[in-house]
Amino acid sequence: SPLGTVKCSPWHYKGNTLLMGDAAHAIVPFYGQGMNASFEDVVEFDTILEAHDKPSTKSDWETIFTAYESTRKIDTDAIADLAIDNFHEMKDHVNNQLFRKKRHLEMALEKKFPDEYTSKYSLVTFNEHIGYREAMLKGRAQDKAILNMLAEGEIDLNSDLRQVLDK
């Protein structure tokens, strides 16, 4: 069956209905983050709910639902984009020599400088301290920089890793 991505808005209706998880933001499985994103929804909703003392009216709930969506949507849209990007990366680039060199350098940088460098994949998958959007922006910038330096011959697989990191 076909795979799809859901990016809808609003996620709520008149203070009595709220979409969460795949109902609000289904994503293709190419990052393996769908369930994690849904669990993050629940944590964020709980945090917002605790900040509002005993909501009792539809207006109270509408305020909560609006706050929840405004904090989550940028991250759920980002993981949806990242999952599609990862599909294309796996489909089109795994045999590309430049991509393979980039991946080799990323792995070496992460291993040698774990406190200073984290690849896009690791930012998304293993770093709970930043949201998907921040991970996407930082990861894309790193990918672009490494690919450009490789393509322009500024670095190669034999380059000193400290110098690569400093660039």
Residues covered by each model-derived region:
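C-terminal helical "tail/cap" subdomain of flavin- and related membrane-associated enzymes
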Residues: T47-K167
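FAD/FMN-dependent oxidoreductases across multiple families
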Residues: S1-D60
